[in-house]
Every structure is written in C-alpha cells, then in structure tokens.
Amino acid sequence: MKKYSGRAVVNGVSITIAHRSIVGLLGRNGAGKTTTFRMIMGMIIPTAGQVVFEGNDITELPMYKRARLGIGYLSQEPSIFQRLSVRDNLYAILETMAVTKQHRDSRADELIERFGLTEVAGSEGRFLSGGERRKLEIARAMVTEPSLILLDEPFSGVDPITVQELQSDIRHLVASGVSILITDHNVERTLEVVDKAYIIDHGKVLAEGTPAQVIQNEIVRKAYLGNSFNGDEFD
C-alpha cells in the first residue's frame, strides 16, 4: 500500500515474478502502475506491506543496496554518459567492481557482442541512435550480472525493427537465467514478450494472467484496452 495525504494510490497489490520469467506491469496513467513499479525498485517506500526479493525483506532498502543484492534497473530517461564511448560506458560501471582488469575486459567484450554493439563500440554515446542507446543501457544494467532487471519503458522512442531486436535481447536474458519486470505504454509490444501480465487500475490489480487471458478479459477491455484493441495474434 502507498498513501499520499491519506489517499491510497496503491492498495493491496501483490505481484510475483517467477525465476526466469518476463512479467508486465500495465495500466492507464494514474492507475498506480508507476507507484507500484517504483516501490519495487526502491525509489518509493510503501506505507504498508512488503517487497520481498529471494526470500529477503527489502522494503526499507535503498536502490543501491537492492542493486548489490542482484536487482538491476533501466530508467526511462537516458542514462548513458554522452561523451564516453560505448566501451567506456561499460567500464564506468565495471571499474566500481572489485574485479581484475582481465575480467573487466572480457565482460565488456561479452556485453558488446551480446547486444550487437560491436560496430559502435568506439562511438560516443551522443552519436548513438535511439535503439543503440537503449541496447547500451540494457548492457550497462547487465554489467553486475543481476538476477532481476526492472525495465521502465524499454520500447519508448525506438523504431519497430529495434523493438523487435530488444524483444529478442530480453528473451535471451531470460534464457540466461535473468527475471524481468517491464512497464511500458506500448501495450501490444509488451504483451508480445511477457509470460504474464498484471493490469493495475485504481491502485489495485484488475486482472492477471497470460497475454491471451488478459486480452480476452472483458473487464480489462472496458477499463484499459478499449474495444478497438485487436490482439488476434495472442489467441
């Protein structure tokens, strides 16, 4: 639960992110989705209730301590260093870790290759396309090898082909053992990649289930998707 001035903007929301799964957190503006997401990431402390990660109560922990436990975060806002190269953006994180230079070099090479950034590895952040920037941001979030990554609007501001590439990257992350929570206004693209979705409305979970289940839910269509939403590909 989260209250502001006595008003509950989130009330009784319970979300489970299974190991190696992709979960979507969706809802209209003002529904409580963003507040819920920020309580999970540690930006907002709940008024009541718990945030539990791998059996540990992390409700009161700040973001940096959650990161140490294995929670990565991709901000909606640009977060790369504009005047550093792709490789140096990765090194900026790697150099905060107590690892050898050999490990830093091999980890940077691995991430650059994994996210298809080899051709732009020497380019400064300010010269990257929107899709390249987004891939670098995800690569940076993976530097510390988190077991859970929170993706805030990963499909925002990128072209359809890059969205498909990002969806593929996300699936590969899960195949490697990472769990993912996504919140994004691009409902269709999000539902294409998630295993399970939670629909938040008026601060509560309106519905949960597979993409096909939430799309076929008449209450969800009325409150969130609208009657014009097709969704035939999810049948």
Q: Where are the regions that the model predicts?
A:
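The feature captures the beta-strand-to-loop junction immediately N-terminal to the Walker
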Residues: L26-R28
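Conserved ABC ATPase "signature" region
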Residues: Y91, Q102-V120, S168-R171
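Conserved catalytic motifs of ABC-family nucleotide-binding domains
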Residues: E145
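Conserved ABC transporter NBD signature motif
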Residues: G49-N56, L69, R107
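Conserved ABC ATPase signature
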Residues: E124-L128, E132
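Catalytic Walker B motif of ABC-type/P-loop ATPase nucleotide-binding domains
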Residues: I149-E153
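Helix-to-loop junction immediately C-terminal to a conserved catalytic motif
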Residues: M41
